[in-house]
Amino acid sequence: MADEQALRQGWTTGACATAAAKAACCALLGDGFPDPVGIDLPGGRTPAFALALAEMGEGWARAGIVKDAGDDPDVTHGATIIATLRHGIAGAGLVFRAGRGVGIVTRPGLPLAVGEPAINPVPRRLMAEAVAAIAARHGMACDLEIEISVPGGEDIALRTWNPRLGILGGISILGTTGVVIPYSCSAWIHSIQRGIDVARACGLIHVAGCVGSTSEKAVRKVRGLGEEAIIDMGDFAGGMLKYLRRHPIPRVTIAGGFAKMCKLAAGQMDLHSSRSQVDMVWLAAQLRSLGADAALVAASAQANTALEVLELAEGFPLGQAIARQARAAAREVLDNPEVSLDVLVVDRQGRVIGDAH
């Protein structure tokens, strides 16, 4: 990724839904489809979106926007966000519906009630403001129905956190600023927080934060946890632990591969390879404390990878030592006596090589 060239920002599903809803509302109330259609976002930005779909019939109008996530590897990039507007029941106000490809909330703990379409609060507000302004121009009450649909959203949702959060049937319509920042950590950390919120609301007493799929399989087998108890922590150990400090769950397991857990053991809370590295000299010192001879310690300090050190350390309980130190480092950040913390370290085959309580 070239440093000299800024990454291109994109637009959230919420921004696209707002633009589609505004265009459809204009058409429904007799103004025709604006193309492009401009919207007002929090923070003052006023993007305009080209319509990918514009159709209407008796009592309804429909508009679609193709989501452009910029240079972010967003799974919803290229999806068409469609809003269908209909006249509602007099006095009922604005009603949101989930069309095909948009999920329904089935578990408590999210900022939406169970049974509601997975259209988050900020996109709801932006859509409500946009259509209310159009209705007011026509001297009408805002008794309208907004249905959001996403063709293929059911399949896209399987590549998101939604099934684990209990959002079923499609994707969520998301966004707080309307803007997608490429490779931003905030979206992942937000998903971690929502996973913890749902676990707490469902009364779970044990969850596991996993670095990836290998550690997830291991922790589910060893700890006997169901899918609903798994938090996709990824590289954001610190983000998860800090949120758990304020929103505790009785028991938490952290599970990850040897290299990532070496970073955690050394006190690094961001485990991404571009933002933290395994300190080989520190790792060699752990081997020395386990009784390794000078030659092995020296070879370990010169190793290129943590995996190489693990192979050199055959016969020494290095995985267990790393698990203990990772638990101590995580415990310090967690800083909440209400939470029981343990750490699992796995090798590349998913075998547990360290388990510290």
UniProtKB/Swiss-Prot annotation:
Enzyme Commission number: 2.1.1.195
Annotated metabolic or biological route of this protein: Cofactor biosynthesis; adenosylcobalamin biosynthesis; cob(II)yrinate a,c-diamide from sirohydrochlorin (anaerobic route): step 6/10
Catalytic activity: Co-precorrin-5B + S-adenosyl-L-methionine = Co-precorrin-6A + S-adenosyl-L-homocysteine
Domain of life, source organism: Bacteria
GO molecular function: cobalt-precorrin-5B C1-methyltransferase activity
Keywords: Cobalamin biosynthesis, Methyltransferase, S-adenosyl-L-methionine, Transferase
Keyword flag DNA repair: no
Broad EC category: transferase
Stored HAMAP family: CbiD (MF_00787)
NCBIfam families: cbiD (TIGR00312), PRK00075.1-1 (NF000849)
Family to which this protein belongs: Belongs to the CbiD family.
PANTHER family: COBALT-PRECORRIN-5B C(1)-METHYLTRANSFERASE
Name of this protein: Cobalt-precorrin-5B C(1)-methyltransferase
Organism: Paramagnetospirillum magneticum (strain ATCC 700264 / AMB-1)
